[in-house]
């Protein structure tokens, strides 16, 4: 399949959780992964694109405004989109643990993906 056809297919289809393999599997052609990269996924990314008709109507002129509802990602955050790659590459590099400074979404995502990878996770909570 040509590059343009594959790109068009990716952006014109709506994935469902039943047949979705996660972001890395879907976009690996354009990502820094190889056959040696362990794909650590929680099936992130198959979130709905929703039209916000009230805003579209206010703008007018046939403009349609859409939002991505990333609250439906595995840990409830868009952070899962990047964490799948971060933990996959850390695992590939031989890391046994990950660490982050966070009070919220990053730490939840890092802990979930590290657990899936069989890695330890450490969260540093900033003072204040």
Predicted regions and their residues:
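PLP-dependent amino-acid enzyme catalytic core
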Residues: 1-128
């Amino acid at each position: 399949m040509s590059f343009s056809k594959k790109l068009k297919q990716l952006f014109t289809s709506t994935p469902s959780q039943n047949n979705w393999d996660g972001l890395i599997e879907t976009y690996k052609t354009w990502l820094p992964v190889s056959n040696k990269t362990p794909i650590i996924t929680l099936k992130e990314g198959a979130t709905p694109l929703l039209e916000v008709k009230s805003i579209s109507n206010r703008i007018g002129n046939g403009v349609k405004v859409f939002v991505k509802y990333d609250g439906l990602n595995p840990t409830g955050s868009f952070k899962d989109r990047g964490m799948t790659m971060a933990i996959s590459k850390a695992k590939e590099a031989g890391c046994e643990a990950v660490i982050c400074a966070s009070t919220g979404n990053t730490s939840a995502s890092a802990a979930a993906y590290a657990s899936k990878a069989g890695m330890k996770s450490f969260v540093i909570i900033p003072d204040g």
